[in-house]
Amino acid sequence: MAVRASEPVRNPNSVPRPAMSDPSRTPRNSSSKSQGEKPSSSSSKTPKTPLSDPFRGTSSSYTAASTSSYRLDSSVATTSVSSHASLSSLRDTLPESAQIYDFSEIRAATNNFLGKRHSSTSSSSQSWRCVVSGKDALVFQRKLRKSMTRSDVLQKLTVISKSHFTSIVKLLGVSISGEHIYLVYEFVQGSDLGLCLRNKMNPDFTVLSTWMSRMQIATDVAHGLDYIHNTAGLSIDMVHKHVKSSGIIVTEPSFNAKICHFGAAELCGETREDGPQATAAAAERQFEGVRGYMSPEFKATGVATQKSDVYAFGVVILELMTGKEPVTYKFDRSSGNYRLISVIETAREAVEGGGEEGVEGRLRRWTDKRLRDSFPVDAAEKLTRVALQCVQEDPDKRPDMKWVAGKISKLYLASKIWAERVKFPTEISVSLAPR
């Protein structure tokens, strides 16, 4: 049979090869840009201008994406990933990198800082909810604790921008003006953990009314903090410094937990420094802390470490167990004075105290009554003991977050098995009305 000249001769037994991709034909909506490509004008209405002091003369178009390990090289397009996934869709799923914004863009987004301020219990600094570069965001104004050069900020921002985890609120970018740094975070719909546990309008109600909902929060926060300590900083010992119940967002409608203010301590110059001069300077500076979450060594030196993060996390776990604040004051009628009660002390009494009722009885009496006594006692006791290990006074005796996250994951699985066993049968109907 004659073959037409317009059709190529093809071996019926051969396997067709995937076509080579042309880097010059990258889709326009791709989130991966080359270093020489100019940012799209649709990403922000405010033109990019050089940063104000102390970064005068530098371009704000710098993004940490140039050094991010999440870039998708065009050479991998020669390999077929899925018949349903295109290169552009893969690029769209890659996390975006944090960037340095023009201060004029922050000023325009906040209406020259005259816009309605966001009521945030997670931070004592001023904050605004606004739209920055087309994204719903929260802008926090914080004071720089030490002078930082341009290279210092770029180095820290590069490391932080490579860190992406489901339990961490994403940092979109920063801007610096004078002695203040403006941290731009994504806005997450939900409420902070402290408000979820303690509703002043209705103290008998909580959205976290089941044991599994609280175990989910504990697991999310443990793995998020483990990621910050052991993965996010790569070769740097990253410290969060602001671990507290008001700094944890319980998302809607999934009721998962996200840690707020990741990278704030690093970018504000609040982290530990090396050398005798740096130690003396840190001792002279004022430091911020929340009562009940500060470890003994942090209160003595003002220096935050990973061990002080572990201490604060242990306090958060005890909050989840009881629903109470870390420290409260109770009036003592015999002395006529108020007595400070720590959730750490009550936890130790619950698992280590004496009495005829035993550990189970003391634990049931100590745990949040709004759980309606429906929780696995064995898992609750083990979780309490893990938290007490985290809040030991000697920082060297505290475990690291990798060990803690592993223990809590096992307790989560054990609690899940318990929840499946006690789950109410759906095929049985119950009526409490009189017949």
Which residues are covered by each model-predicted region?
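Short beta-strand micro-motifs within the conserved protein kinase catalytic domain, predominantly
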Residues: 170-181, 189-190
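Glycine-rich ATP phosphate-binding loop
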Residues: 123-146
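Activation segment/activation loop of eukaryotic-type protein kinase catalytic domains
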Residues: 244-301, 330
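Structural motif in protein kinase domains
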Residues: 188-204, 325
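Conserved catalytic-loop aspartate of Hanks-type protein kinases
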Residues: 309
